Amino acid sequence: YGDLFTPRQLVALTTFSDLVQEAIEKCRQDAIAAGLPDDGVGVDAGGTGALAYAEAVGVYLAFALSKQADLGNNLCRWEPVAQCPRQLFGRQAIPMIWDFAEGNPLGESSGAWVVFVEGIAKAFAKTFEFVAVKASGLSTQADAGCQDVSNAKVVSTDPPYYDNIGYADLSDFFYVWLRRSLREIFPELFATLATPKTAELVATPYRHGSKEKAESFFLEGMTQAM
């Protein structure tokens, strides 16, 4: 997706991405000064000390980096009513446009880093109001076709729709930037250069050789998952 950014936009994204790691170290030092234990256990290992705190802040900043990529590329459209740039992904596809609008990442309006950070902070503040301080959770990745976590449980999900959406291909737009900032925190999650695609449950003929093979792959996989 490198061609979807101007050289100036790539410089901005690369700079913000590099600063995420600097911010993590600064947060760690501040957390230690505030009295959090410096146990060296990261957030991926379930840590609760200074390092885990700093890495969690880094994850939130990476969310802002994703917003920056979405609103800082050469396919952002102009919104005539609000008079501001709009994001690339208005739907689950990359659009074609005649011209593009570009915000100022160092400004204070649409497309600015400070706007992304403040928006994410407000969203988390509202979310955390409903989460107990001592509440703990666990998230894992597993193949839906062979996992047993959902046995005897009701699971509500929005499944893939044949070849309607190229989830993994589109995810690479954000994945490469997240990996650049977070692979030291989540080495297993970001082990690959791009998102895994071989086992993705979508009926894409170009990946399976024909429409019939793609449909068969999708139906068999969906049957196992169900």
Sequence positions of predicted segments:
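Nucleic-acid modification enzymes, centered on SAM-dependent nucleic-acid methyltransferases
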Residues: Y1-K153, P160, N164-K211, M222-A225
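Soluble or luminal CAZymes and related metallo-dependent hydrolases
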Residues: F217, G221
